[in-house]
């Protein structure tokens, strides 16, 4: 979309700030920023979180890094889409790194939530009771509350793709590998999502 023969970067006015909100590797964010700089364009590395409802209501959480100029020029966009904007730093890639670490938690929470509900079912605990206990106790998380509600309701309509977490937890694994940092829980969650994707 941005580069190549039909890319928009070559048509943007010099000094324009471009907001990149995809969940991508830090190195990819840095490469995009460098390529945009070649067109005299600013980049805000600004991944988002919050789901479809928060997106529709302009209440996303944005994890952004970039220059003061990029933040200033994109302030109206950030105001329109975000309930909360975190300024992570000036270097592109920092926002992406925070999002990747966030996705570690999101993926592990979904996997652990599914495992807990499966164990409850095997133990004969009514799923609505288990859900109510967890959502009113210390073990709750936004992901449990959001995703396990569908399990309780017997709603197996796809609301998002399993492969999103195969990709995102893959980014988590790549980030950890580059930093020589072990992540046994995230690795297990990635295996679970990969198995689900191949089912």
Segments (PLM) and residue ranges:
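Rossmann-fold dinucleotide-binding core
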Residues: 4, 14-18, 23-103, 107
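Beta-strand segments within the central parallel beta-sheet cores of soluble alpha/beta enzyme folds
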Residues: 128-136, 187-191
């Amino acid at each position: 979309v941005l580069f190549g023969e039909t890319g928009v970067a070559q048509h943007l006015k010099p000094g324009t700030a471009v907001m990149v909100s995809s969940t991508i590797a830090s190195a990819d964010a840095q490469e995009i920023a460098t390529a945009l700089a070649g067109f005299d364009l600013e980049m805000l590395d600004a991944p988002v979180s919050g789901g479809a409802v928060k997106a529709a209501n302009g209440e996303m959480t944005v994890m952004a890094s970039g220059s003061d100029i990029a933040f200033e020029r994109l302030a109206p966009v950030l105001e329109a889409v975000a309930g909360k904007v975190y300024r992570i730093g000036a270097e592109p890639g920092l926002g992406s790194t925070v999002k990747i670490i966030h996705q570690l938690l999101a993926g592990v929470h979904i996997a652990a939530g599914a495992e807990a509900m499966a164990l409850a079912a095997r133990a004969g605990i009514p799923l609505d009771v288990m859900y109510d206990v967890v959502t009113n106790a210390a073990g709750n998380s936004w992901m449990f509350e959001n995703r396990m509600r569908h399990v309780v309701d017997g709603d197996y309509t796809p609301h998002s793709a399993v492969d999103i977490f195969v990709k995102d937890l893959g980014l988590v694994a790549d980030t950890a590998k580059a930093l020589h940092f072990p992540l046994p829980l995230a690795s297990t969650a990635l295996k679970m999502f990969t198995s689900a994707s191949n089912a």
